[in-house]
Curated annotation (Swiss-Prot):
Necessary for flagellar biosynthesis. May be involved in translocation of the flagellum. It comes from Pseudomonas putida. GO terms for cellular component: plasma membrane. The keyword Protein transport applies. SMART domains: AAA (SM00382), SRP54 (SM00962). It is found in: Cell membrane. This is Flagellar biosynthesis protein FlhF. Signal peptide: none annotated. SUPFAM superfamilies: P-loop containing nucleoside triphosphate hydrolases. It is a peripheral membrane protein. The lineage of its organism: Bacteria, Pseudomonadati, Pseudomonadota, Gammaproteobacteria, Pseudomonadales. It holds the Pfam family SRP54. GTP binds at residues 225-232, 303-307, 361-364. Belongs to the GTP-binding SRP family.
Amino acid sequence: MQVKRFFAADMRQAMKLVRDELGADAAIIGNRRIAGGVELTAALDYKLSALAPRVPNAELEEELRKTHTRIATAQAELDHRQDSSDNNRQLFAGQSLTAAEPLIEPHVDAPEAAAAPAPAAAPVDPRLFDAMRSELSGLRELLEVQLGSLAWSQLQGSKPQQANLWRRLQRIGLSGPIARELLDLTAEIEEPRQAWRMLLAHLARMIDIPEIEPIEEGGVIAMVGPAGMGKTTTLAKLAARYVLKYGAQNLALVSMDSFRIGAQEQLKTLGRILNVPVTYVDPGQSLAAALEPLLRKRVVLIDTAGLQASDPALRMQLETLAGRGIAAKNYLVLATTSQKQVLTAAYHSYKRCGLAGCILTKLDETASLGDVLSLAISHELPVAYLTDGPRIPDDLHLPRGHQLVSRAVNVQQQDEPSEEAMADMFADLYHNPRRAG
């Protein structure tokens, strides 16, 4: 029997390493979380004689589903216990906690006796909760990968036409839940080409696009997002678009980016070229006070700093934008060249300030639009603008759902997706279960 350990950043990558080196017959005999990722222990020619006879696929899938549900339930119970433990520490601070006394049936003839004090409950080490949560997370991720592989294999055998549509959606880069929703909408269509056309039409309708262009609606508009997404360039395109259409007298620019070298100089140059006033807001300075002299302007465009999620200044910036008296419409600027994890992290970091929508940049450089479209659809983020080049303002466009979908199809992967990629797509379905209702 050949036994080997594999290290990777996440469970899916670890499973791929196992498959590549030991093949599909390898058995996973251990897994644990480590610093920087996961560790899998896999074996080849693992003796299974002590185990129960092989279960048919349908039954195996059902058991895996039950186990997946149990893990989710255990995770919820763990969270509940930790919350209860925290609440008890707050409610009984300064008091000694005792274990509950056993229930004693009343007996009239028995003489009353003073109950002996119960021993104090031992404090729970928070590290125990962390270890349990980490182990549960690893088990859940492993199950998701296995369930995804099993579900994909069964679909290929039972519904080859639908499996082909899944492959085409995976080439676009759409997430598993979005693909499933699209296929549910076209389940009754048997002709493959018609089904594909309807899938794309439904996808176009899923993309939320504002009825009124943001700069036409007016008000305070802020560009938010991580560094490198194209916030300042997008702001320059919006400002030039407005000036060319309405003139410079009702436009003002504001910079909250005092962290990046040369950021304020860029905006100062833009203001000079467009003949538009530029206001600079330093950290800790009141944004409301800075905006007060600009209240008569029809449009105020704000450029913000692209800060890391761990930077304390980011929280201050988001709280400022979400503060009373600001009424800013915050648009998350997302580079379509970014990886899925980067896009997801950006959304979760910046949603705290309240997002009015998103602006998709660098469409001319991207190799896939699936990840960013999946994010916008799943989080109901309206797509306000698109940019696809360096020209100001010529490379700024209003989105159209069918044009975005057409572009996504045009830049899709040329090669057929691997079996591992399809299994990962199905694993995403278990990681993001269908919502009730």
